[in-house]
Regions:
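Generic structural detector for well-ordered beta-strands
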Residues: 8-10, 51-53, 66, 99-101, ...
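Glycine-rich portal/gate segments that line the openings of hydrophobic small-molecule binding cavities
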Residues: 40-84, 182
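A conserved amphipathic terminal alpha-helix motif
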Residues: 121-156, 168
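Hydrophobic pocket/interface hotspot
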Residues: 18-22, 28, 67, 112, ...
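Beta-strand/loop substructures that line and gate deep hydrophobic ligand-binding cavities in soluble
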Residues: 69, 83-133
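Hydrophobic ligand-binding cavity/cleft-lining segments
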Residues: 1-45, 49-55, 161-183
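Intrinsic-disorder/low-complexity, polar/charged segments enriched in Ser/Thr/Lys/Arg/Asp/Glu/Gln
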Residues: 2-10, 45-47, 60-62, 76, ...
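A generic structural micro-feature
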Residues: 1, 40, 55-61, 88-92, ...
Length: 183
């Protein structure tokens, strides 16, 4: 199942500070629910994992993200990611482009376009539910992203407890949104 998700949001931080954070996958991963970077392969390639909890079961994906384009002058980035369920029940791939725009008030606008392809157990939920779950996850990402931007810089190898994404409760909220006609 293929999805395209376009999101734009603003943060009250200068573009250079946002770019420093957004152009480092190790920092960004700390904002993604259930995700972690496990290994730096080279300057543009990272291995990682993400856990998704659906009801009582947990689905674990392992994969790789690679920066294919990094334009520091224009604050644009393109990332490709791919991963496999460790139990062989599916896979996912993603192409994400991001662009930053400085705002007159000193803040930054973040523009993100993601093309996602999901195969297997998660794809069985259907595109409307997956889209709603993605919207909820993106909201959590934005909240965490804004909080981490405001923290003093302590390096990018932050240690944190990684908890699986609770897609079961997200799917329930997403289903309620679908039935209310919000998607």
């Amino acid at each position: 199942m293929a999805l395209k998700i376009e999101k734009t949001f603003q943060v009250n931080e200068p573009v250079e500070k946002v770019w420093d954070f957004l152009s480092d996958p190790r920092k960004v991963a700390t904002c993604v629910p259930g995700a972690q970077i496990t290994e730096k392969v080279d300057e543009k390639t990272y291995k990682g994992a993400i856990s998704v909890k659906v009801g009582p079961s947990v689905t674990d994906y392992k994969g790789e993200v690679r920066i294919v384009r990094l334009d520091n002058q224009n604050h644009e980035i393109e990332i490709l990611g791919k991963g496999q369920d460790v139990r062989g029940r599916g896979s996912a791939s993603m192409k994400m482009t991001g662009k930053l725009r400085a705002l007159p008030d000193g803040g930054t606008e973040v523009i993100s376009v993601s093309e996602i392809n999901v195969v297997g157990i998660l794809a069985q939920m259907g595109s409307r539910i997956i889209t709603e779950v993605s919207n909820i996850m993106f909201g959590e990402f934005i909240k965490s992203f804004q909080e981490r931007l405001q923290q003093p810089s302590e390096g990018s190898s932050e240690t944190r407890e990684v908890k699986p994404i609770k897609a079961g409760s997200m799917a329930w909220e997403a289903a309620k949104g679908v039935f209310r006609g919000k998607s």
